[in-house]
Amino acid sequence: MEARVISCTTFGDNKVVKIAVLNHQAITKYKAGENETTVVVSDDTCPEKDVKEIKKFCEKLGYVYEGRLSEEYTQTNTGPDDDWITNGFESDDDVDPSIKTIGFNYPHVNRRNKLPDPVEKEKSVSLWSMIKDNIGKDLTKVCLPVYFNEPLSSLQKCFEDLEYSYLLDQASEWGKRGNNLMRILNVAAFAVSGYASTKGRICKPFNPMLGETYEADYPDKGLRFFSEKVSHHPMIVACHCDGTGWKFWGDSNLKSKFWGRSIQLDPIGLLTLQFDDGEIVQWSKVTTSIYNLILGKLYCDHYGTMLIEGNGEYSCKLKFKKQSMMDRNPHQVQGIVEDKNGKTVAKLFGKWDESMYYVMVNQGKESESHLLWKRNKPLENPTKYNLTRFGITLNELTPDLKEMLPPTDSRLRPDQRYLEKGEFEMGNREKLRLEQRQRQAREKQERGWKPTWFSKEKGSETYRYIGGYWEARDSGRWDDCPDIFGQVH
């Protein structure tokens, strides 16, 4: 039997090794005791005879084999991504080993790894033919057929920005250890990482109904997220997330303009991150544009200046460089971290769709560069929507989950569900029906309608979570939740 070590990273007393065995991918976690190292094989698809060979192979390397992981921790047949092992880090001797292994104790949760196969063949419809009469208008108010959507709502897209939430876990831990410079660097990497999933994504998310919600209970990431559409005109979505050592919240009013060959999206809103020790950090997103609406390949770009600041020791300024037509090195992000005296103490550089690095600056001299964040590997066979592995999980609806959700959750939206299954005609029919209902939303708002789970802060236009959602979920009481999607015909 062939067996070889693909990679081995040492984290203090812990070792994580990936072994390839025949046609099976076996991920093994080595945990070192005082006098021995134990080996756990987590691929339950591996035949028993191969497991015996793995045992011999491991013992030959000087390790003691201890068997497989329990079913609760067994990975999917495709095998987990390498990032499950390293938490996004490459080997770096300057990084505390215990920081790298944050999140290893989170439970594994089996989630789907592909969308359903489409039932119907999709129609070819020109985007230009649908929007050519709306030059200069706000496209959030333009109704498009379901063919131009992706099977996610704007509420779910808010959660997608938290794909690399481990960076905030690490930021929390750095702060606990008194290293607030590494904290702000990890926060900056997180602020950039949310854009990585947009590469190749040209379809529009569904505009939520007034009062529509979305929950994401992800113990495998150590967090719980909740969002709600709190206003129809202007269109505002608000979110709140409880993480491990931190809380994150914000609202977003997205202004869009169509300029003929491109669409410009300007986010209006403030994102707030609060650590358990009281430090608060805030920033706003940069401008996004989608190009080549008439001719050529559609692509998106993000550009502008992002300021990350709060009540801590450091602030960060990131510059997202605008892509030019002849740019051979697009998507660049550069930034600096300053102390309270305005002195530059670190620099950042990278690309929003690849990775971010940092260098320390001391008396004008720069250290070697170190990796902060690296994008997860894309799918080998992506769908037309170019969703990431994480993105594919966002609209998953299991029977058990369906029983617990309120009637306002995005997963229950019929046009979005039909689109995901590739039932385009039914999806379009339902989208038209719901848009008819949505036209009543402004009247509701004018009559004094208020969000169920969020309210404006006193003296501010910012929406904050008022609590109660997870308690209602635990009790199964959704009496205050309207049937916003109505009867499905």
Swiss-Prot record:
InterPro entries, per this entry? OSBP_sf, Oxysterol-bd
Pfam (any one): Oxysterol_BP
Q: Which GO terms describe its biological process?
A: lipid transport
Provide the tissue specificity: Expressed at low levels in flowers.
Molecular function via GO: lipid binding
Q: Does the keyword Transport apply?
A: yes
Q: Which keywords, in A-to-Z order, does the entry hold?
A: Lipid transport, Lipid-binding, Transport
Name the family.
Belongs to the OSBP family.
Q: Sorted alphabetically, which PANTHER family does this protein's record hold?
A: OXYSTEROL-BINDING PROTEIN-RELATED (PTHR10972), OXYSTEROL-BINDING PROTEIN-RELATED PROTEIN 1A-RELATED (PTHR10972:SF96)
What is known about what this protein does? May be involved in the transport of sterols.
Q: What protein am I looking at? A: Oxysterol-binding protein-related protein 1B
